[in-house]
């Protein structure tokens, strides 16, 4: 079946009766007209009143408000999504700022941990190791022929929560909800997938309700052969699809990206998406301060694939914006992990970490307490302007470290990006109080505004949802065949151009979520234009690209149905 979304055109539907009501992509519930009820054998299967989508959304909102806990609200919204997707997205559109933290971080973390417990209905595709020889058949079982975006995880590193096994499916479902709500990509074009290669989470293995394959994780050559087979099956079924890798473990995330980025249109959101939104935030913050990012010194706490991905994107921008050499740019970036500052004499570094070391000889003048150079040592000696946390460990940005940074930096930029909120390196409340309100703070999860000395500071959420929906829309609209680093930087710059702090001199460094659909369209244009310039998409006029973006932007509105046969 192929569902085409052309605005204001009727849809020809081969389903009727209870089958139609059970199809979330097509179900309108009480909004089916009397004519449609007659034509599709729905008479008597629905209450008498024909409602508008806004009337349905108002009822759903009131029901949503009755739930007391975030996880119950999440379950309720997922039930609507699995019943009537158009209503689900209209509800999100009406209340995005309230509902985004419910459908995604931080609440989605709890939903992943409790996936088997709260499971109601299948969504997406589950490919398990025991079924590895049936991948082609499994993907053929998906009834939608024109899938355009896949988000896939193996559940091994879910947010900051670690191995959640099959429970990691909550992440692709949540991410794709944002592709639609923020980026206008039709839900009919999206597919969440989990690769179930077992779990090393003993709690899950012992849980009688756990729905995944009960076996320790498959690793090494067998694991990579499994993913190879998956990629080939996807290419055969949907050769032009955009594939997003999500929440793979550090040891696999970068190797998988490097292995497939020239074979299929793909990117890793934890590495490249996080890097793009962080870079966009830093570009805007630097411009608001009247400086360039290439003039700043930056310290990272966390040298995994996400932290190193952000660092590499920043270094590339420094070369582009400030004309720095690669060596000059790398000298301004300091990576700290649990063993201390990464230096060129450290053993057992991963390949992507070894490119980001500081030369030990250049640190001879530093005042340090031991051979292992701590985060405090780095802050005291390097005197950074920017501190970024991607460690997944709470409380590591201590009062001493933040105050030390503020001694030499009047307006420090502090970004504790770890998710969920329980893993944040420091809270905005503490950071702003330790700096007397001077710090510019952006976080990975949502936080309430903070009041310091009778002044209230809104907290920017450095959320990947500002970036990946627009990237997806741009790739679909331009027909891009690959995702390049330059396309990611174009997305960052487009995001920075929407900063209220830059454009008005006040407010947040990132735009409000109420603007996110327009932000996504502008990012899509920048990404599509760069794809054309780099030869990974067919060149068109700017007007044609803009038109394609508008035509591809799906809106949660009911359309009239006409009956047809399969």
Swiss-Prot record:
Cofactor (UniProt): Mg(2+); Mn(2+)
List of catalytic residues: 104 (proton donor), 175 (proton acceptor)
Ligand binding (a divalent metal cation): 246-247, 270
Residues reported to bind NAD(+): 157, 270, 419
Key words, A-Z: Metal-binding, NAD, Oxidoreductase
Cofactor mode of binding and number, as noted: Divalent metal cations. Prefers magnesium or manganese.
GO biological process, one term: malate metabolic process
EC number: 1.1.1.38
CDD domains according to UniProt: NAD_bind_1_malic_enz
Site feature: Important for activity: 270
Reactions accelerated catalytically: (S)-malate + NAD(+) = pyruvate + CO2 + NADH; oxaloacetate + H(+) = pyruvate + CO2
Annotated PROSITE patterns: MALIC_ENZYMES (PS00331)
InterPro entries in alphabetical order: Aminoacid_DH-like_N_sf, Malic_enzyme_CS, Malic_N_dom, Malic_N_dom_sf, Malic_NAD-bd, Malic_OxRdtase, NAD(P)-bd_dom_sf, NAD_malic_enz_proteobac
GO cellular component: cytosol
One MF term in the entry's GO annotations: oxaloacetate decarboxylase activity
Enzyme class of the recorded protein, top EC level: oxidoreductase
Database matches in HAMAP family: NAD_malic_enz
Subunit structure: Homotetramer.
Family that this chain belongs to: Belongs to the malic enzymes family.
Official protein name in the record: NAD-dependent malic enzyme
The organism of origin for this protein: Cronobacter sakazakii (strain ATCC BAA-894)
The organism's taxonomic lineage, starting at the top: Bacteria, Pseudomonadati, Pseudomonadota, Gammaproteobacteria, Enterobacterales
Underlying gene: maeA
